Amino acid sequence: MASQGTKRSYEQMETDGERQNATEIRASVGKMIDGIGRFYIQMCTELKLSDYEGRLIQNSLTIERMVLSAFDERRNRYLEEHPSAGKDPKKTGGPIYKRVDGKWMRELVLYDKEEIRRIWRQANNGDDATAGLTHMMIWHSNLNDTTYQRTRALVRTGMDPRMCSLMQGSTLPRRSGAAGAAVKGVGTMVMELIRMIKRGINDRNFWRGENGRKTRGAYERMCNILKGKFQTAAQRAMMDQVRESRNPGNAEIEDLIFLARSALILRGSVAHKSCLPACVYGPAVASGYNFEKEGYSLVGIDPFKLLQNSQVYSLIRPNENPAHKSQLVWMACNSAAFEDLRLLSFIRGTKVSPRGKLSTRGVQIASNENMDTMESSTLELRSRYWAIRTRSGGNTNQQRASAGQISVQPAFSVQRNLPFDKSTIMAAFTGNTEGRTSDMRAEIIRMMEGAKPEEVSFRGRGVFELSDEKATNPIVPSFDMSNEGSYFFGDNAEEYDN
């Protein structure tokens, strides 16, 4: 990106650091991972989990959720002020699964939030360690991104289900800070803004008074985050217009939807981070590995190496395919829900299938599901190669006025062609140039029309052998052009919010 110099790296966002050099960043990210690992070990002790039970991803999710809820200040305040029957605002908990007499049993545990906060701080040298909390939020968000399709949410805000590749991070909580904002897709930001504008249309006082001033500040901040994701001057100019609007209304919603559509070809820059479940970090720390000393990065080989040597298990429902469950979690661990499946198959070394072809539901088990028929199996999270993560959106030339990877939001900096029928997307723009911004719109449409689908993104970039830690010998994969590489496209995956 042109303004890269003014931006902090992901790792700095991840660790709230001021400018640091690469070694310091690796150390501070490592420190964050150490903290999560130590916390997880302590929780497994508290809950008396066996080694196997501690490596069960469902237990990991419950423990992660408990600490996130213990630190959710706003919700905790809300619960104190609006007591609801049967919910103790001071407690947090969830299902913990244990192996008893050859069967999996569900046990509901309840802890004081204060106690959980104490254990977390103790594991993090007395700090609140917000970066570690955000890291877990992003892991949950990546898991949601691979598990559910957000068609319904898209349609509700007046967007098109075809925009699902723009929805990264759509389930991240608002409190996820700079690191969270970095991984949100263009569609996610547009949706948050549209919801805000709609509230303003329906509620006369939304922008007024003391509260309205804060609201307005939040609105402009969100506009700036979205503007920073766009890589062409015309898209950014339209964002300025949306931000400066005296009284945001339907015209702004129209502009935002137009911008979201344009991002299908002129991709935004969206960060990708490998955030792994706590049950991966825990055993690594327990085995004596020192992440802070060794250094760790979320965007290089480190997560691949860690997964290569990790044992993680999952509960499996009677009619689920363990290999498919593994693919789901593998994609989440590599934040690759919107990456090209041809590329993922190459990196993983086994075929990666679209969501609708997978015989698996989500990783979480609902409280009313029957445990008697539950089995467990090992998740296969290893990869054949590793690749460097990207946030560029895959646009092919330096002015960025070119085809990004259409219908995919690239997660890896690896050469690929653009396998998608551009005319389908362009059809969404025909005849819709009225409105105040027609000059900018015309400019954006012109750039999109000039985007050549036969171009190659990330030219010359390749994947690497796992033994090639310094990334010296790129292997540039060759792909079958005829295959379209999107995971959700034309798919019937389960909805996140049904």
UniProtKB/Swiss-Prot annotation:
GO cellular component term, pick one: host cell
Keyword entries, A-Z: Capsid protein, Helical capsid protein, Host nucleus, Host-virus interaction, Ribonucleoprotein, RNA-binding, Viral nucleoprotein, Viral penetration into host nucleus, Virion, Virus entry into host cell
Entry's Gene Ontology molecular function annotations: RNA binding; structural molecule activity
Domain of life: Viruses
UniProt motif Bipartite nuclear localization signal: location: 198-216
Subcellular location: Virion; Host nucleus
Short motif Unconventional nuclear localization signal, span: 1-18
PTMs per UniProt: Late in virus-infected cells, may be cleaved from a 56-kDa protein to a 53-kDa protein by a cellular caspase. This cleavage might be a marker for the onset of apoptosis in infected cells or have a specific function in virus host interaction.
Skewed-composition ranges (Basic and acidic residues): 8-21
The UniProt record lists the keyword Transmembrane: no
Chain segments carrying region Disordered: 1-21
Protein's GO biological process: symbiont entry into host cell; viral penetration into host nucleus
Known function: Encapsidates the negative strand viral RNA, protecting it from nucleases. The encapsidated genomic RNA is termed the ribonucleoprotein (RNP) and serves as template for transcription and replication. The RNP needs to be localized in the host nucleus to start an infectious cycle, but is too large to diffuse through the nuclear pore complex. NP comprises at least 2 nuclear localization signals that are responsible for the active RNP import into the nucleus through cellular importin alpha/beta pathway.
Subunit organization: Homomultimerizes to form the nucleocapsid. May bind host exportin-1/XPO1. Binds to viral genomic RNA. Protein-RNA contacts are mediated by a combination of electrostatic interactions between positively charged residues and the phosphate backbone and planar interactions between aromatic side chains and bases.
Protein family per UniProt: Belongs to the influenza viruses nucleoprotein family.
Protein name, UniProt field: Nucleoprotein
Gene source species: Influenza A virus (strain A/Memphis/101/1972 H3N2)
Gene that this sequence comes from: NP
